[in-house]
Amino acid sequence: MNKFKNIAVYGGGSFGTSLASLAAQNCNNVTLFLRDEAIAKEILHNKTNVKYLGDIKLPAHLQATTNLDIIKDFELIIIALPSYAFDDSIKLLKTHSISKDNTLLIATKGFARNPTALFSDRLKTLLPYNPTAFFVGPNLAKELAKNLPASASIASLDIDIANKIAYNLSSKIFTTNVSSDIVTLQVAGALKNIFAIKSGIDLARKQGENARATLIVAALKEIAILSKALGGMQKNSDILLEGVVGDLVLTCYSLGSRNTKFGYELGISSDKQKFLQEYKELVEGREALKLVLDLIKKYNLHMPIISEVASCVIPYVMPAFAGMT
């Protein structure tokens, strides 16, 4: 199978940088594209991204730049940006003349917005001709950057594209599997962050490990409910992919997850309204929650865990949505 001659990673946060490090294990021409000139220079000269990954050393041949004009020259472009920036970032790529020859791997988790949609649906409008796949897995950024064992699922409607990407990213310590169910992988990647908030709240309430295991089972059922409503879950076995059950378990069980940490800190807070108003760190589950409620309402779905998390989070910051729970 052919290898990509070069790989771009668009997004210089913790996950984007760790994915660039992962890609560089198998490819000698990997460039990280980011907005912060100082971080780009740090990666080039020191091979670190201290702001996001501490003192973890990055591969010596990893390049970094803020110049998006050259991203069109890369065969594989990995998108690893926050969900709120997805639409604007894809539109920006279009202005930099990426062509149908550029393969896209979407590692962003969440939903497109205005209106709420899967990223795959938004790409049908913005970049309909590009080969596209989705990357979801139980991957803590710092562990990926340290080259510790991990796995992921690669999903694409074109299974040959999924296989090619998997071949380019796989190694003895990073294993992949492929799927054509792009809907379930996207839904799982978005919802797992919401369930992690619930896990953190339960941890703060000292609910115990039995409750957390029960949460995992109930969460998988809700992933299946929304996935089926959006056209996914053609095979029940899709729920067993690393990008579904593996990512869910990791995110819900690790305080290294920003979402679990957020839920825990919310749970122990004595003034929850003040906590929610003053919490500045990006929490993808909090962002996704505002959007998934649109889908629950649109398709008239019963998803009690999502509703419970909304009742804990949204009334304080978005009172108009409280009645939807």
Curated annotation (Swiss-Prot):
Pathway: Membrane lipid metabolism; glycerophospholipid metabolism
One Pfam family named in its UniProt record: NAD_Gly3P_dh_N
GO molecular function: glycerol-3-phosphate dehydrogenase [NAD(P)+] activity; NAD binding
Enzyme class label: oxidoreductase
Example GO BP: glycerophospholipid metabolic process
Known role: Catalyzes the reduction of the glycolytic intermediate dihydroxyacetone phosphate (DHAP) to sn-glycerol 3-phosphate (G3P), the key precursor for phospholipid synthesis.
Protein name according to UniProt: Glycerol-3-phosphate dehydrogenase [NAD(P)+]
Source organism of this protein record: Rickettsia africae (strain ESF-5)
Taxonomic lineage of the native organism: Bacteria, Pseudomonadati, Pseudomonadota, Alphaproteobacteria, Rickettsiales
